[in-house]
Amino acid sequence: KRHGKRPCLVPYGVSSPLGAVGYASAIDEIFTQSRELDFRPTAIVYCSGSAATQAGLIVGAALAMPETRIVGIDIDAEPERVRADVIDYGHGAAAMLGTTLREADVEVVAGHAGPAYCVPHQATIDAIKIAGTLEALVLDPVYSGKGLAGLIALIHSGRWPKDSDIVFIHTGGA
């Protein structure tokens, strides 16, 4: 500031309305690729912790893919806090993009975080083994492993019809 510049502070997990706008634009890539490959995602599932990613995905999907549900798997064992943060960042991102956030579109699924943040449970370890063995996909026990464990549980529960196209986003961490 002393030099006449406008510094940009980047919070943990890029958790801000502006950070959410970045993931709103990620929906454009998913939209383009799904059309090129001739499928329409029923849902996009990912692990939700710092909340801006999910907020951005929801705002972006509302604009480009309104038929697609965004499902966040809580990885912090704090689903109420995560949902509140998604709503907060989502309203801010939506305002930046000239739209609104429907709070009914915010879904944070609890029960897959294990005992606490950074502490995996058996379903997470199993999901990591499945992904590595069947797809050569490297997952970590803090984020993506918990997210995939949640997705597997939702599939086994019959959440979606068997012919549904579900996109799992691996945001890193491994």
Task: Describe each model-derived feature in a short phrase.
Residues 15-20, 79-80, 114-118:
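Short, small-residue-enriched loops and turns at beta-alpha junctions
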Residues 20-107, 169-174:
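Glycine-rich phosphate/pyrophosphate-binding loop at beta-loop-alpha junctions
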Residues 162-170:
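C-terminal capping/lid region of NAD(P)-dependent oxidoreductase domains
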Residues 103-163:
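Active-site-adjacent helical/loop segments in soluble small-molecule enzymes
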Residues 1-3, 91-97, 131, 161:
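A polyampholytic, Gly/Pro-enriched intrinsically disordered region
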Residues 2-48, 121-134, 141:
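Active-site/ligand-binding-proximal alpha/beta "capping" segment
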Residues 13-15, 50-51, 113, 144, ...:
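Short glycine-rich anion-binding loops that position phosphate/pyrophosphate groups of nucleotides
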Residues 7-13, 72-73, 108-111:
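Short beta-strands and strand-loop turn motifs
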